[in-house]
A protein has these predicted regions:
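Glycine-rich beta-strand-centered segment in the early N-terminal region that forms part
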Residues: 23-38, 50-108
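Mid-domain Rossmann-like dinucleotide-binding core that forms the NAD(H)/NADP(H) cofactor-binding site
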Residues: 137-192
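Cytochrome P450 core scaffold surrounding the K-helix E-X-X-R motif
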Residues: 42-47
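Glycine/charged-rich beta-loop-alpha catalytic/anionic-binding loops adjacent to active sites
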Residues: 123-134, 158-160
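Residues located in well-ordered beta-strands
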Residues: 2, 16-21, 33, 84-85, ...
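Extracytoplasmic/periplasmic beta-strand context in beta-sandwich domains
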Residues: 18, 100, 114-115, 136, ...
Length: 192
């Protein structure tokens, strides 16, 4: 199968198209054929890994670098979100079957910039809403996960007013939708 790989940190020039082995799902995994995957800040950070890219204290840079790889990346296929179709399911998988359209968030494991990927059934994977295309569904997981965690920290209650700064971005757009439709808040969004 084809995948976009990188073996060193740097600019987009370190990315290249390569043939890699097609994964085989374990008993608790699905094999998904990737139809769409976005490029986001996590991909940029993992590929470039410059300290200036991190929005964190310098002391956290060291453990992050050890986690991702000191001299070269430990994970060499980027892509933290995807939408695609289940091609095969491990023998203990019960929630998904071949042919199901799914979307998923892979987190630091990444790997979605490939034709196929294995995802644990109990991972952050769900049936893709029928009214969304693959490209639309692939962009949802990261923004929704971040937005819901921020709204929970805010202890938002029905009827409360909330201002969402950056309402046109991936996280902000999801925060607006979740605050209004899930929490019942009065939402004002700003961007610029």
């Amino acid at each position: 199968m084809k995948a976009v790989v990188f073996t060193e940190y740097g600019s987009p020039d370190v990315l290249r198209l390569a043939e890699v082995a097609k994964p085989t799902p374990k008993d608790n995994e699905i094999l998904a054929r990737v139809r769409a995957t976005p490029v986001n800040y996590g991909d940029l950070t993992a590929r470039d890994f410059a300290h200036s890219q991190f929005n964190m204290p310098a002391l956290l840079y060291l453990p992050a670098r050890l986690t991702f790889g000191w001299n070269k990346p430990k994970v060499n296929i980027l892509g933290g979100e995807l939408a695609g179709d289940v091609e095969a399911a491990g023998k203990s998988v019960t929630k998904f079957k071949p042919g199901d359209a799914v979307f998923a968030y892979l987190g630091m494991n990444m790997g979605a910039n490939a034709e196929y990927i294995c995802i644990p059934e109990n991972g952050m994977v769900a049936i893709k809403p029928a009214n969304l295309g693959y490209a639309e569904a692939a962009t949802l997981p990261y923004g929704a996960i971040m937005a819901i965690s921020l709204l929970k920290k805010a202890s938002l209650q029905p009827g409360q007013k909330i201002l969402v700064n950056g309402a046109s971005g991936g996280i902000g757009a999801m925060a607006v939708q979740l605050a209004k439709h899930h929490y019942g808040a009065q939402v004002t969004g700003v961007c610029g």
